[in-house]
């Protein structure tokens, strides 16, 4: 019948066999070799003899009989002795619960387990009860309800546990609460691994401080510091609050609320206690009630009406009292150690790097707890040759060759284990304690039983009547497990067994059960029935072998009935390490074997790896055999060559003999071939008429078809020739058409080019005429503008010349007046009778009095407004730079007194004199272009002159005075030139001249230019 997929489910036992329980979290399943058990035992554990005691059930007796058996040289099923590969003790609790132990195998199936080899770890075998119907499955194979599975997992609720423990502690009487605090405080002085005389004398843990906890000196120092703060700085209310904070620390430690991601539990608990103390404080109550009454929020009547609703604990009539010294000391110690632990935890978190996120949750408590036991065994120094490992196996010194190396890191591992243990909540610690006690009890019980006898064999099971079929392990190899089974057709199941044999099984040799390894259906398991054993004389009815296993791995073998898919039993077995040197080199064993079964996928992978290793080994052996065969063949060939050489090198007689034998053999073969050919010829001569007629018919058909083929070929050839002629004519027509098209295209291209040249020539000629006309018009406009500009410049230059002529005439008039004044001054000085000696006034320093100076002599003889040749000129303007006032009044520009500073030395220059002349060599350079016809092109103002590039025109007065000219000689020429007066845009100012005179009888002057000379240059 088809096997159900329920057999492939995992049958792992999620038990905390490591000494500590998980804090409400589900342990991650190790699909591949999960090393959660610390150090493991390999191969054979010990060579010493051990014993086993088997408790057999009996429905007729109330006590369990004890059957001593031997396992020094265990007997195989075929009767030959075989040395055991490891000590295997098999205590079997047939009607109860059996715990795993070291190097032992338990089969809980109302039967007896016999072990003869291999290391069989502690399995959890169970017997399934018979169902009412044959097709009813066992509860283990039935589908598991998720809600039922979730209800079996203990949830981790550290906040709820911490708050519940805190509420419980706050409700305890003072005496009981003091006792609880004392017990909690005493835990800090005990080593985590337990106190013993050996540990105290060897390691001094009480003084050095156990791993993960501070030392005794640190504790005393912190307690003293906190006690000093308690007595000096804390008042009564703060002391009572700190006392309740000690309760909070106890609750957080026991409830596990201060570790992991539950940091908010501390704040919540402290907040609850703080709010409770604030509400119960009499000072705060008086302050709040007084504030409410003063602000008229509530009235005294309302307060008295609702005050009875508050509990009596909150209505204080007197202030709090200080706690007793004993409770104060305990609270100080608890709070000091809490602060120290927080500081150490924060420092360790900052110092250690963050572990990588692997995505798998590992039972760290289990691993740490198991390692602690091993470390304690290392450090205890007790004179024992072995100790109990974390997974219940006896760990011997042979399994720890590097024990001294790991002993150096024992303190570090113990610190980690103690840190994990300190973070366990109270209920987890209780569960861990219970598991440890139960395991130690079962271990001691198993050791007491094995001390009374030897393991039993299959011969000891003869004559025993069992209620149901029994399966036991007979031999364990590195890659195979051999087992045997009893009869599965019991008396109470005769009807079902008969039905299976008749219908489901079909024959007596049909397998009554199948094997699943680690939850996976194992196809390489072979089961065969034992026929030679007489009925009633032996319990062995079935024998089987599970192959394809990996060495040094743990497996969980499930035996399931074929008819009902019920589990007969579940056995946990660990295969020993291989002893073959070649296989060890080819197969890579895990670095640390696991005693827990792997997942089905991992099991199959390991089996595949083992099979591949064996295949590679066989291939290597085959290659080695091939090489050996090649060597043998080469050796044989050498011998054959040697024999041939000896044969050829023999005498003539031998050669003749060999030749005659060869000829005889050839003659015989030729005769046989000749006889065979004669028989064939005889058969061919007698041809039947029917076959001859068929042959003639077929030949006629062939000739007819051949004629049709020839005619078809001729028709095909004629058709091909006709088509070829048509194709050739069409090709010639096509070639001629292509040539005509090419000629037409070339002609079209030539005509298009001519057309484009004509169009471009026409367009180019029209554009050239327009361009020339535009250029001519532009040149005419530029010439007109240039002519107008020159005309304006000539007119402006003429106006400037006229202005210069007028200015020169005015300057000559001023020079005449100055000369007359100087002459009069000299005459006056000569007529003055003043002292001329050096002791008196110096020459030229005798001031003239205004009364002595004749006014008529100082006035200008020229009229204020005169006319020359019909031209009217404006009166002389005084220079704006002249500072001395006129001697005759405001209308005169001459100096007022000849005694003062001579005014002719300070004559200001005209702005036209400062500017450079338009007639010099620099006149051709202009900032403004002639083509720029602005609004002021005819008027050359101050912007037309660049005074920065021309030296100012300075008039030399001495030259003017020394010049002997006739009046009107040059001026008349300049005035009679026919130029009309033009208003000048330049503003004229007083000119500045230079003169020189002496205190002699007269003076002389000279001028640097004349109007005639300037005019001549202009013309």
Swiss-Prot record:
Composition-biased stretches (Polar residues): 68-83, 102-117, 131-142
Signal peptide as annotated in the record: none
Sequence segments annotated as region (Disordered): 1-142, 343-372, 580-603, 831-859, 879-905, 963-1019
Membrane topology: Multi-pass membrane protein
Coiled-coil stretches noted in the UniProt entry, renumbered to this chain: 602-788
GO-annotated cellular components: membrane
Full protein name: Probable ubiquitination network signaling protein acrB
Job description of the protein: Component of the regulatory network controlling carbon source utilization through ubiquitination and deubiquitination involving creA, creB, creC, creD and acrB. Involved in resistance to acriflavine, and required for normal growth on a range of sole carbon sources, including fructose, cellobiose, raffinose, and starch, and reduced utilization of amino acids, including GABA and beta-alanine, as sole carbon and nitrogen sources.
Biased composition (Gly residues): 992-1008
Entry keyword Repeat: no
Transmembrane segments: 163-183, 216-236, 259-279
Major localisation: membrane
Alphabetic keyword roster: Coiled coil, Membrane, Transmembrane, Transmembrane helix, Ubl conjugation pathway
Domain of life: Eukaryota
UniProt similarity note: Belongs to the acrB family.
Biased composition (Low complexity): 33-63
Subcellular location: Membrane
